[in-house]
């Protein structure tokens, strides 16, 4: 890296926006792949909802309820624009935004509703070996229920899914292809456009898990050419408990509801019900209006920073992180040793030391990382690892955070190194 590039990640104008980071300058928070921190604007938005318009949205004609409804619909429009879900005139395709609790629920919705609508015995559902459990288990279950086959796209030695692998696994038997945009363990960015092109050529639907991409890179659902895309607010500076599912209008119209109950119907008799139109059809019961409002605030905050600038800064942070880890001869990177191949996350191990021990000692040094299988056990089995350490960066990190991690890892080796060497 050049001195100018290092200077860009030394300067940090962002931490002041985050109360928990500003109040704890001694902490190097490197676990944003698990959950991001929240800026003051988001915290204040959620609080202001309860202070100024707390009412059940969609269910009242009085002012607070009307304002709560407007808050939800305003957030829906902001989120649509954030992921490029706009028509040719630039109008947000708000009705194609469905609120769930998280990405996991959104993917369960897709597997259940689209799976029931689409799959029959002998069909293929194609996913990748690098999926989070949330994009594996729902498909395992629906394949068992329908008699469909679950097929895995596998990586090459560079931790990439090759065009040849895409062509060989996505065949005319494929009916649904569901792939993560970015691996939550390796940080690998998959070529969604190429996978979607093959899926559509074979007559399959394309589903994208964008939980690890939406916080870090610009998203345009039309450019990706996907049919459904899911992500979580809490990984992109929003509150916990809010997920988002976008889908093509005609597909959402055709899919049956996932959950049933209040507000997702047009009419009910003693023996039947008529579903409400999308998105209400998929939003049974009372929504977390305050959380949705705060998610809208998170999107506006990120838009104000410019996602292209966030992507560039985080690329520099990932490159510096990989570069510094490579200076430690007792650390093995799990994944690519090219920093530019990592979006957000870098997995590694300290030779001979369990990741939980590494994480515990780093915690004593005010460095917060993740240790374990990261809800991606099939991937770790493929990599012949039982668990790894994972450091994940966000735009509010800086060079000092990574330097603090390296100092902490040296402390880990100081404690364990001699015992490991004598084994």
PLM regions and their residue ranges:
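Pyridoxal 5′-phosphate
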Residues: 1-423
């Amino acid at each position: 890296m050049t001195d100018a590039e290092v200077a860009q990640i030394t300067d940090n104008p962002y931490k002041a926006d985050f109360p928990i980071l500003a109040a704890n300058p001694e902490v190097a928070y490197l676990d944003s792949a698990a959950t991001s921190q929240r800026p003051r604007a988001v915290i204040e938005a959620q609080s202001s909802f309860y202070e100024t318009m707390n009412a059940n949205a969609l269910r009242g004609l009085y002012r607070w309820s009307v304002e709560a409804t407007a808050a939800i619909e305003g957030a829906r429009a902001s989120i649509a624009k954030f992921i490029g879900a706009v028509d040719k005139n630039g109008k947000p395709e708000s009705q194609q935004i469905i609120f769930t609790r998280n990405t996991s629920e959104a993917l369960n919705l897709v597997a259940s509703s689209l799976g029931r609508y689409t799959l029959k015995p002998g069909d293929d559902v194609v996913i990748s070996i690098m999926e989070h459990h949330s994009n594996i288990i729902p498909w395992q279950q629906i394949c068992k229920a329908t008699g469909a086959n679950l097929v895995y796209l596998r990586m090459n030695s560079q931790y990439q899914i090759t065009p040849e692998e895409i062509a060989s696994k996505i065949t005319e038997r494929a009916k649904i292809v569901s792939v993560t945009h970015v691996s939550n363990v390796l940080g690998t960015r998959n070529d969604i456009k190429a996978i979607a092109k093959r899926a559509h050529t074979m007559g399959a639907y394309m589903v994208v898990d964008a939980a690890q991409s939406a916080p870090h890179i610009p998203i345009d659902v039309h450019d990706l050419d996907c049919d459904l895309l899911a992500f979580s607010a809490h990984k992109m500076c929003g509150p916990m408990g809010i997920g988002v599912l976008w889908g093509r209008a005609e597909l959402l119209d055709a899919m049956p509801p996932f959950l049933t109950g209040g507000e997702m119907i047009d009419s009910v008799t003693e023996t039947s019900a008529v579903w409400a139109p999308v998105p209400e059809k998929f939003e049974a019961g009372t929504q977390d209006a305050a959380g949705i409002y705060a998610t809208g605030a998170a999107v506006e905050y990120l838009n104000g920073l410019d996602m292209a600038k966030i992507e560039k800064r985080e690329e520099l942070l990932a490159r510096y992180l990989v570069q510094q880890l490579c200076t430690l001869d007792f650390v093995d990177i799990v994944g690519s040793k090219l920093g530019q191949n990592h979006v957000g996350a870098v997995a590694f191990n300290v030779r001979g030391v369990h990741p939980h021990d590494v994480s515990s000692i780093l915690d004593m040094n005010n460095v917060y990382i993740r240790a374990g299988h990261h809800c991606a056990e099939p991937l770790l089995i493929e990599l012949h690892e039982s668990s790894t350490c994972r450091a994940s960066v966000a735009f509010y990190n800086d060079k000092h955070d990574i330097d603090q991690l390296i100092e902490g890892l040296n402390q880990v080796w100081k404690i364990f190194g001699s015992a490991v060497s004598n084994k």
